Amino acid sequence: GIYNSNRFVLNALLRRLGCEVLDLGIVPDSREATRQALREAAEGADLIISAGGVSVGEEDHVRPAVEAEGQIDLWRVAIKPGRPLAYGRVGRHGPEGARAAVPGSFAHFIGLPGNPVSAFVTFLLFVRPFVLRLQGIQAVEPQAVTLISGFDWTNPDRRREFLRAVHLPDGRLGLFRQQGSAVLTSAVVGHGLIDNPPGQVIRQGDAVRFLSFAELLN
């Protein structure tokens, strides 16, 4: 079966940031149902977050639905995991039955990838600082530290990678063995993310940039 782990993870992360969450549940897999959900969400929320449906498949309705109800300002980012990320705005229609959106009135929209780790990582990197800025907080960037690698990473991606890592007993960083974007265990058991530049090979003893989950979830 398919389990909607994103729903529970995102709810918990948002509440941790002090947000009031309006959970609209699972939207039926059609463009019109997605548009209706966006219209409903825009009337009651400052920020709309979706998980999945922002890629280019035949059943990925979120992007065209947002474009129909507002606009997409950003689509796709060159990171791994998490490339199919979208940011846009959804117009508010005002009084019930109004056909046109109210000029200048909108809810922000962030579309996250559907894979659990991708959704988790992009939430920490993009949604968290965005929400903090909406709350009036200026210092929103997590503080990274430099630590020493206890592993070899010899097949880097062309994109900027965020590798799930664990602290080793000797003080170095170890790599979580399964880096797949569907393996949410790596976020539960891991201690943070290594921010690795595009194409960068990592050898044991190299200095790496580390973002701890304690910092990212603070």
Residue ranges of predicted features:
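Phosphate-binding glycine-rich loops and their immediate beta-loop-alpha structural context
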Residues: 1-50
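Conserved beta-strand edge residues that scaffold enzyme active sites
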Residues: 28-29, 55-56, 205
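Secondary-structure boundary/capping motif
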Residues: 6, 33, 57-58, 118-119, ...
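Flexible glycine/proline-rich
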Residues: 67-218
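Short acidic, glycine/serine/threonine-rich loops at helix termini
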Residues: 34-36, 60-62, 89
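Short Gly/Thr/Asp-enriched flexible loops that form oxyanion-binding sites at enzyme active sites
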Residues: 57-69
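Catalytic-core segments of thiol-dependent peptidases
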Residues: 46-55, 70
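Short glycine-rich anion-binding loops that position phosphate/pyrophosphate groups of nucleotides
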Residues: 53-59, 114
